[in-house]
């Protein structure tokens, strides 16, 4: 199936590494296992500081679903268990042993029954890689998904391409074969043919995939690479019982690597990007999953007060505090550095704005349709919060036809029934990142949707499963 998306915004932000950039290798001293994505689920910690762990060792367990573990990607020693407000689990920090783990696993995918395969996924931390729709929560083992969507079309700013992720392996063919094994495992686990969404420029091993998966291509501006867009065009979610799972290309590689090679895939590709980073420092690295920023960034840049650190891309990533020695998030493959101006731009309202981004033609750049690299992207809000006046501008950049402003208003009043009627079942917080970015009212739509989905899932979805 060929999908063409016309709505969205083709972001060309300054600070991206060159696609041909060299993949250097960094073996970090510290890594963390990010537990923030599991906020809807109560977790039980299985380790304490000073415990020795190996790759694949259980670090945390779903309290409501015993036997489902979140595991360590590396060998090392647990040094800290970080908690936030109300003692919410944030991450488990590990002092990594040098080198790659040699902990060997032996699973024969062909001989495992579907029931045994599920136990392997739960025990080895593979089930924790899936996300569940509606409500964009960690997948629940009690649910049988209608469909599984595998995303190879992610086009968020600065996100490494599929080709870059294949740099982890000896050859592109080797990487794709590992991916095929991962797809085979998913197809057998759920007894279905998953949907694989890629772009036209990717050359997939279609002969190996066509018998075990549905293959689709998508073309269009950001956010055409979001799972919500794929689900909407291929098989829409129409009610709360319409459960689908989503998973990324990198996570399928982790599944295939365990079954084919017998080792936990503890490494990942990371992009160092952002307009605050000198061009010579914008590059791709091969490093451990969850690596600490201090091991990946130059000391003078990491400690600068004039730079904002983000784990992930600039639109959906997590804002990090330097004093906490931040680490990469669980699903993050980018470290973004943006300038943090201390003063407002003088007479900004009188400037032509040739290099400024606008959707409403507030600046001169809005009258030119040619693709341009927008300069000097920083954390300046350029004003304070205002009432929402023009609701139509959000629909121009939303890849799926949902009334963005009406959903936000329903969520702000906690009217979940109305929000679901308007399309909340089809969306995730990331779908509101672009409306938040171009919003003249400065409303934090991304945060509103994220907090609302978390609250609703805790009260209605997780407890009833």
Curated annotation (Swiss-Prot):
It comes from the Bacteria. Keywords: Ion transport, NAD, Sodium, Sodium transport, Translocase, Transport, Ubiquinone. Its EC number is 7.2.1.1. InterPro entries: NqrA, NQRA_2nd, NqrA_C_domain, NQRA_N. It is an enzyme of class 7 (translocase). One of its GO terms (molecular function) is oxidoreductase activity, acting on NAD(P)H, quinone or similar compound as acceptor. It catalyses: a ubiquinone + n Na(+)(in) + NADH + H(+) = a ubiquinol + n Na(+)(out) + NAD(+). It holds the Pfam family NQRA_N. One of its GO terms (biological process) is sodium ion transport. NQR complex catalyzes the reduction of ubiquinone-1 to ubiquinol by two successive reactions, coupled with the transport of Na(+) ions from the cytoplasm to the periplasm. NqrA to NqrE are probably involved in the second step, the conversion of ubisemiquinone to ubiquinol. Belongs to the NqrA family. Composed of six subunits; NqrA, NqrB, NqrC, NqrD, NqrE and NqrF. NCBIfam families: nqrA, PRK05352.1-1. This is Na(+)-translocating NADH-quinone reductase subunit A. It comes from Chlamydia trachomatis serovar D (strain ATCC VR-885 / DSM 19411 / UW-3/Cx). The lineage of its organism: Bacteria, Pseudomonadati, Chlamydiota, Chlamydiia, Chlamydiales.
